[in-house]
Amino acid sequence: MADRAMTRVHSVRERLTDTLSAHKNELLALFSRFVKQGQGMLQPHQLLTEYEAVIPAADREKLKDGVFEDVLKAAQEAIVIPPWVALAIRPRPGVWEYVRVNVSELAVEELTVPEYLQFKEELVDGSGQSNFTLELDFEPFNASFPRPSLSKSIGNGVQFLNRHLSSKLFHDKESMYPLLNFLKEHHYNGTSMMLNDRIQTLGALQASLRRADEYVLSLPLDTPYSDFGHRFQELGLEKGWGDNAKRVHENLHLLLDLLEAPDPCTLENFLGTIPMVFNVVILSPHGYFAQANVLGYPDTGGQVVYILDQVRAMESEMLLRIKQQGLDITPRILIVTRLLPDAVGTTCGQRLEKVLGTEHTHILRVPFRTEHGILRKWISRFEVWPYLETYAEDVANEVAGELQATPDLIIGNYSDGNLVASLMAHKLGVTQCTIAHALEKTKYPNSDLYWKKFEKQYHFSCQFTADLIAMNHADFIITSTFQEIAGSKDTVGQYESHTGFTLPGLYRVVHGIDVFDPKFNIVSPGADMSIYFPYTEAEKRLTALHPEIEELLYSSAESTEYKFGLKDKTKPIIFSMARLDRVKNMTGLVELYAKNDRLKELVNLVVVCGDHAKASKDLEEQAELKKMYSLIEEYKLDGHIRWISAQMNRVRNGELYRYIADSKGVFVQPAFYEAFGLTVVESMTCGLPTFATCHGGPAEIIVHGVSGYHIDPYHGDKAAELLVDFFEKSKKDQTHWDAISNGGLKRIYEKYTWKIYSERLLTLAGVYGFWKYVSNLDRRETKRYLEMFYALKYRNLAKSVPLAVDGEAAVNGKICTLGC
């Protein structure tokens, strides 16, 4: 059994003991207050509220000289089981310590991770005692693996990895042979690239590179590679160095410099020039994945938009690189999703669909099936688990048939796509990239501790297990923001929340993931700039759409597309667009607007969510629909609000953002948590001032007061006042609105474009593919551990999820596991 503290054993215990000795009465009063409330869990805001209520201001000033206030502010939760109070303390992102205070004796003890989790389990099972509880611990497999120690290094994994491994691998001539072997074995569909068999030693490589460089320097810079390729073959060099003499010279020099004086930047630049990625498979099984008429359907939103924009940018970058590398290879990208025979007016029943705006990218749809048949209908993303093992095998077969080759990179999306990506990458030995989009454990508070309460509706035991498998199996993980990995000073990151947690009665995660792991890289997406562009670019504006946009916003009649109306069309508009579910918190926006009379005087509210034309099958959406109607009726919002059904037309949505900007309105994103916030980027790219949740990605996208504003959805009254203040200032001074609009645009151009994204992603794929080849980066030991965890734990959990009822005869097929 594991028996370790996560970091810095004793330090907090010693400091707390000293503080208790110096301020016994004050702290006894506080901890007694905690215990008096009885058994339970206290959140950070509750701890600070009690601290301010119990300790007088003068005494709090005295305590500031010690460490207690810092410890309390760093506490992410307190578990109270009288007479004990246990604290989970997070001094900085990614670093955790655990202590327990006996209030009766004022004694402090340090807890190991298993001890803390076992104590926490007593909130559920009453005793926390078990003869044996499975503990999941990945730390021993990574103990000898390098990782940074500074929080600022989190999310910059490839830079750290290059620094460390370049110094390790290139410390002498002999250690460079893995690079030589990598270049010699590099090929595509049996055709050699970079080097041929004429070069067998490093000395021969350097000599050939120098002779080749002398030769190309004698040629005009624009001489095509085809004119001198035969000469290069004689020197032991094959295609892949460049398309003309100038580029070949640059790339030859990169490798010569690397062999002479290795450094991480030169290494990354050189690896970025090697042709490595030609076939990409992107997995996104759940929901309705199509190019039209699906946005707003259950489980269908930002992830679909993200992937469609992603593949267009990736294909462009792949084509550019292949051309610059002097190759005649056609790249392929396959977006693999679920085929839905009951396609309900979409193309989701079509096996193969070309992606518009691309030449070589397709959506490949593969159905869910069991021995009872093919599943015809849509099912929630929370119910997909029993289908994924068979699905992974079916997808592998379909992909092999389509590509006639093994993919070079597999990218998973969300929990289901990442699990299927893990199964496929494990079987094929392919580089795997994980993109979470959202990890559900952080969206539903205490859904780990009280997982049994959520199990019937959400099956979180399967999902959390799948997430742990995927994040530990991946070669690299990309996130849109730092917060997604490690949160902020005050909030825990999505991945960080998987460091240590418990599913009582199932297993304890002693060490689930390390946010300092160099597999983490921040690669932020952008908006499609052919659709989303500033409202000031008059020559590009789609004015032909204005009549239907005006009808959408202001028509006095109601329809299946919009309900309620706006009396005063001259007011600016608060605009929001999202799925209608609890986390997106659209009803929270309506409520904060409804409760602020001054805000209602200043502006109208337009929300785009849900579907008035059909009854929802989604339980959360049903509850939010009911709440929305109730708020509109209670606060008599008709005349102030326009409620529009989910809009499928992205082109019109882009012009809708700009039309709202014409009214000098704003965009509000009120989610309780948002992993990234594509709509935030879209609105800012259109020049629309944006107010967005402070919980998650938008807190990084927006610089508060410069390129937009942060709002706290848990404090709707303060968010409403912030909006009132903005509109009142803008009413008095037009330049105030303009300043935020321009600040948002500047921020986008600096950090959030698909061009930057695609360049970075393909470079990462090459770098991690190289390191996987030349080092132990494939983490074989971890993957064997994962095979056992998958077979003994995940598989049984998946079987416990009820199958949907419908189908037709299916063809028998082999079942794939992590060990196959």
From Swiss-Prot:
A Pfam family assignment: SUS_N
Reactions mediated catalytically: an NDP-alpha-D-glucose + D-fructose = a ribonucleoside 5'-diphosphate + sucrose + H(+)
InterPro entries: Glyco_trans_1, Sucrose_synth_GT-B1, Sucrose_synthase_pln/cyn, SUS_EPBD, SUS_N
Record keywords, A-Z: Glycosyltransferase, Transferase
Gene Ontology biological process terms in this record: sucrose metabolic process
Recorded superkingdom: Eukaryota
GT-B glycosyltransferase: region residues: 276-753
Entry's EC annotation: 2.4.1.13
Molecular function GO terms recorded: sucrose synthase activity
Key word Glycosyltransferase present: yes
Spans traversing the lipid bilayer: none
Function statement: Sucrose-cleaving enzyme that provides UDP-glucose and fructose for various metabolic pathways.
Family, per entry: Belongs to the glycosyltransferase 1 family. Plant sucrose synthase subfamily.
Protein name in UniProt: Sucrose synthase 2
Highest classification ranks of the organism: Eukaryota, Viridiplantae, Streptophyta, Embryophyta, Tracheophyta
